[in-house]
Amino acid sequence: MTISSTTVKNSYSGNGTLDTFNYTFKIFADADLQVIIRDATATETVKTLTTHYTVTGAGNANGGTIVFTAGNIPTATETVVIRRASPQTQAIDYIANDPFPAESHEEGLDRSMMAIQQLQEEVNRSIKLSRTNTMNSTEFTIGDTDRANKVFGFDSAGELVVTQELGTFR
């Protein structure tokens, strides 16, 4: 099987009655999904497999569905986010002098591609510098106590710094 889609996340609006939502990407096991509910105040809650929802379609290249259990159906003010969350492990073990295991080898390649896609989705949500940027300091070396109640800024050389508060803005 190939991984021909780059989709790793689906989002839907709840309505208080709909309990079934599609995910449109392959997973190998039910536990390879993360289901998050985002409410009207932007609070995110990760739901628990079998407690809050069940999964169908593991192993299907086109995805499947999640079904919320009774009492856990998303309301009209909630957003359902379904993300692939494959384990970041490698479980294939080749045995010396055995015939080449094409199926398990391809599964390993698929799992690697899934991990790459998950990482790319996270990178796509991060703050980035352009490819031609010449900024040298992209790390913060001061600890959390020294960063507390401060803002990101730029020094006279255009380098990233953590600076004092600006007026009454926090």
Q: What positions do the PLM features span?
A:
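N-terminal assembly/attachment segments of tailed bacteriophage virion structural proteins
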Residues: 1-110, 118, 122, 126, ...
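Function-dense linear segments that define catalytic or interfacial modules
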Residues: 129-131
